[in-house]
């Protein structure tokens, strides 16, 4: 049976998440859904999967149930299909932030940073500047191991290990951003939106977020100006610019990304180890995910 995968997020002030949690969990369990829903004072972030009739019912529920006071009435969802259920259980969690930056929570009522859509961004990159003539700098807000799977050509990559490091590296590298148009990007939009809001809040000018992230860019314009694939936080590991799963896998032991060529190594034992963590290896660098870094999101 085909499984429908849904992802969505929104920065919006929420005051009743403690009351919502058991009700949302009960509805998801009744529908037979699995996945993760994060609720925080600054908004919602979710990735769920199930049969078509169940996911359609959930979309109708969250958009129209009076419980949510219309806060998600136009919530956009990203949808993909898979041959199996990628999640083991259904979790609804309360968090301080829907994506952890360890800074004061985003106040959505103060407005979001401007966004740029995929086609406009491609045009800017084609011509080498934005419509005002400023050079365009792509800023990767993802973790280093994700960047290693693929990123935009000549993107700034500060090799962060977790998103909470982002404010410090931006402060240390402000000179890289002066006089330029900055486009922050991530997998599906949530990190680059929060990153853009933070940069705007600390006085950095001409900052945009890539609307819908890398995956929306792939959907709209393909892989132009992008090198490699896009890491995703689910069983698929990585998607190519055609949004098809690649041959990359995630190591069961250390969560490193193991490309197809590394899977031919005698140090790769499915379900046990890979060249990055094999006990007999001297320490081959791996594209390693931080355990529990974040739930699957925005794909």
Curated annotation (Swiss-Prot):
UniProt keyword list: Oxidoreductase, tRNA processing
Q: GO molecular function terms here?
A: oxidoreductase activity, acting on paired donors, with incorporation or reduction of molecular oxygen
Top-level EC class as recorded in UniProt? oxidoreductase
Q: Which InterPro entries match?
A: Rhodanese-like_dom (IPR001763), Rhodanese-like_dom_sf (IPR036873), TrhO (IPR020936), TRHO_N (IPR040503)
The EC code for this enzyme is 1.14.-.-
Its domain of life reads: Bacteria
Q: Which reaction does it catalyse?
A: uridine(34) in tRNA + AH2 + O2 = 5-hydroxyuridine(34) in tRNA + A + H2O
Task: Please name the PROSITE patterns in this protein's record.
Answer: RHODANESE_3 (PS50206)
Query: Sorted alphabetically, which PANTHER family does this protein's record hold?
Result: RHODANESE-LIKE DOMAIN-CONTAINING PROTEIN 7-RELATED (PTHR43268:SF3), THIOSULFATE SULFURTRANSFERASE/RHODANESE-LIKE DOMAIN-CONTAINING PROTEIN 2 (PTHR43268)
Protein known as:
tRNA uridine(34) hydroxylase
* Species annotation: Burkholderia mallei (strain ATCC 23344)
